[in-house]
């Protein structure tokens, strides 16, 4: 999943040009569709923020993205916001684990800084993603 996700997010960053909305001429629905094909489900959340804060792109509802889910690589729960904050420090993270005792559902996390576009050092961004479902990829 992480290899499929990076190109989608990179394209998303290029298309959104650090604006809360895609630039003129970019179809936000097409970007959402590309994310949906790569990792989408009703329980998927993808957030790209400026390194200093401010949402550039969100896939998933606010309710979905506000969920607290198992951290997988540490005790307790974590959130998209905690992962975005860690990504701002340069931390890259991938983790997955079961969310149901009988292993019927799982969560997969990925987060980190996005590559800086050539000549665009003022456009540093971070991302955080989770997918929680029966289809969440293990060993992300």
Where are these regions (language model features)?
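Sec-dependent bacterial lipoprotein signal peptides
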Residues: 1-16
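Non-catalytic interaction/Regulatory regions outside core domains
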Residues: 18-45, 50, 55-140
């Amino acid at each position: 999943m992480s290899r499929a996700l990076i190109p989608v997010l990179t394209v998303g960053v290029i298309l959104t040009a650090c604006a809360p909305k895609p630039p003129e001429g970019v179809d936000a629905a097409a970007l959402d569709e590309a994310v949906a094909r790569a990792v989408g489900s009703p329980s998927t959340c993808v957030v790209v923020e400026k390194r200093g804060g401010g949402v550039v792109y969100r896939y998933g509802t606010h309710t979905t993205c506000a969920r607290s889910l198992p951290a997988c690589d540490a005790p307790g729960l974590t959130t998209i916001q905690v992962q975005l904050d860690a990504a701002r420090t340069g931390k890259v993270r991938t983790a997955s684990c079961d969310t149901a005792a009988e292993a019927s559902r799982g969560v997969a996390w990925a987060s980190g800084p996005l590559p800086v576009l050539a000549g665009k050092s003022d456009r540093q961004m971070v991302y955080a993603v989770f997918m929680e479902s029966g289809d969440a990829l293990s060993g992300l």
